[in-house]
Design a protein with these regions (language model features):
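Conserved AMP-binding/adenylate-forming
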Residues: 1-104, 110-113, 127-128, 138, ...
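Flexible lysine-rich "adenylation lid" loop at the C-terminal edge of ANL adenylation domains
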Residues: 186-201
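Hydrophobic/anchoring residues in structured secondary elements
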Residues: 142, 182-185
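AMP-binding/adenylate-forming catalytic core of the ANL superfamily
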Residues: 66, 71-72, 95-178
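Glycine-/small-residue-rich active-site loops that bind phosphorylated ligands and cofactors
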Residues: 3, 158-159, 191
Length: 201
């Protein structure tokens, strides 16, 4: 999960020096490193550390190849083939974009993508981050609701109009296909799995 950029900036302002790292068990922890202490790069995953090769494939998925990448899952060639392609690239499942300075920025998880009937792909995490900027939103999940982009929002009943107004303003900044056109509210915390991650069902 990504850190809140505002929190990172506050830590820097308090005198801390931050180093952010992106990686996974299957790459021995190797990945991207971010030494940035200010905007805009403090919100990035980082840049390649030089130990392996990195690229974004045609879908924007982060791929890693080199000595840091595992040979495969123990006695599970099928699972290995699902994550490592014939050219040796490990597909992380994370979607990102790369800026002109070589920094990678998280967009979302490939498995969470909402694929619309029109062919466009929508990252729910991107919209959740934007929606979370509304102070009335305690937590939220963006998902497909009856062929619409919808949001399930946890907030107090008296602040629901504030959230609706925020979504209206947010939608004006988004392409038509990304706009949130359905919203449901919950006064209770949203359901999570045993790992503490919000459920998208």
């Amino acid at each position: 999960a990504m850190f809140d950029p505002q929190m990172l900036l506050e830590l820097v302002d308090s005198g801390m020096y931050l180093t952010q790292c992106y990686g996974m068990t299957e790459t021995c922890g190797d990945g991207l490193v971010n030494y940035a202490q200010a905007e805009p790069h403090i919100r990035a995953l980082g840049r390649p550390d030089g130990h392996c090769e990195y690229k974004l494939d045609e879908t924007g998925e982060i791929c890693i190849r080199g000595g840091c990448v595992m040979l495969g899952y123990y006695k599970d060639p099928e699972a290995t083939a699902e994550i490592i392609d014939a050219e040796g690239w490990l597909h992380t499942g994370d979607l990102a974009r790369e800026d002109e300075d070589g920094y990678y920025y998280m967009v979302g998880r490939k498995k969470n993508l909402i694929i619309l009937g029109s062919g466009e792909n929508v990252s729910p995490e991107e919209l959740e981050q934007k929606l979370s900027a509304c102070l009335a939103v305690q937590e939220c999940v963006v998902k497909e609701m009856g062929k619409k982009i919808g949001a399930l929002v946890c907030c107090s009943e008296d602040r629901q109009p504030e959230v609706r107004a925020f979504i209206t303003e947010l939608n004006r900044t988004l392409p038509l296909y990304k706009r949130i056109t359905a919203v449901e509210f919950s006064a209770d915390p949203l359901p999570r799995n045993t790992m503490g991650k919000l459920l998208r069902r």
